């Protein structure tokens, strides 16, 4: 049986030494899968884990920086200082929501127009929306130009002021104007224009009532609380711009009558006179008598101030005589200047003229050039002496002088 299988005998005769030096390529292909995977991914695991994390963080920072550059300028200026990553992501989310809402609104408008329906908004509101959109585009272009060519940064105060001003103007332009009735055209106060012009231009609008008496001729009005120059147009109200410092309108200066007028104290001088010990405030100036003394310096003593005295500036030397010890003309004015004051203010003649029953009491005192002196010799006056002429004038005596025009010689 063994003879029938010759190859079996030959296999049994083979020993281990017979296999030395033979090359079997199939033996090298039998490798485990784990070793093959390690060989293929050896280059991937060469870098440490911290370098991989650094690359990942760098990619995140690069994307956030690109988002920051793509954000509009008005969103960047809402936060002062450095924009953090979380702030950039929040602003990006806010901007995307606004764009989504705008896109949805435009899509609804397009569908409404395709279906033949009318616009959801009135034409005026649609125009305001279009203007607001164009205004925002122009403001964005201005900010980009300033940042590119003028080197403006969002951190600068002037850039923040410009954005605030543009936002105020856009807000006011979108506010609907309330129409005023009866044809009174009141000009609205522009908040944006007031913010741009500065503190000296900031003012409050005060409507001024027109003089509508029939038959009045237009004349130049010099009152301080008048909002127009005298030529008042019928049927239209004027608007006056007053400085913000005054909480009340400026008081009018009392006009002096030609005959029998009493000098009332100006309200602007009452505070200073009371503070200096001049007495109580003048609640009713016409009820109390006025003492009108004169302190006249000699021309030689007041020669150094005489070249600066002018008729137009004498009214600032007038003080109410009831606030003693202040005289009527203060500080001392020479006799020539007093005569000039009397000539500049003719209304003082009726006040300074003595009543008939008191003419004898002031016979020896010097009189001004425009008054009629009573009969009697005048006493000489020393060169450096003062002459005090106190005289009280009551409202009753002033009324009596007004009824006797012959005694008021100009």
Curated annotation (Swiss-Prot):
Domain Orange: 131-166
Species per Swiss-Prot/TrEMBL record: Mus musculus
Protein name (record): Class E basic helix-loop-helix protein 41
SUPFAM superfamilies reported for this sequence: HLH, helix-loop-helix DNA-binding domain, Orange domain-like
Subcellular locations according to the entry: Nucleus
Cross-link (Glycyl lysine isopeptide (Lys-Gly) (interchain with G-Cter in SUMO2)), chain numbering: 31, 121, 240
Any one GO CC term of the record: nucleoplasm
Coiled-coil ranges per UniProt: none
Induction per the UniProt record: Expressed in a circdadian manner in the liver with a peak at ZT10.
Span list, region Disordered: 209-255, 360-410
Complexes and interactors: Homodimer. Heterodimer with BHLHE40/DEC1. Interacts with CIART. Interacts with BMAL1. Interacts with RXRA. Interacts with NR0B2 and HNF1A.
Function: Transcriptional repressor involved in the regulation of the circadian rhythm by negatively regulating the activity of the clock genes and clock-controlled genes. Acts as the negative limb of a novel autoregulatory feedback loop (DEC loop) which differs from the one formed by the PER and CRY transcriptional repressors (PER/CRY loop). Both these loops are interlocked as it represses the expression of PER1 and in turn is repressed by PER1/2 and CRY1/2.
Sequence ranges assigned to domain bHLH in this UniProt record: 44-99
Tissue specificity as recorded in UniProt: Expressed in skeletal muscle, brain and lung.
PANTHER family, per the entry: BASIC HELIX-LOOP-HELIX TRANSCRIPTION FACTOR, HES-RELATED (PTHR10985)
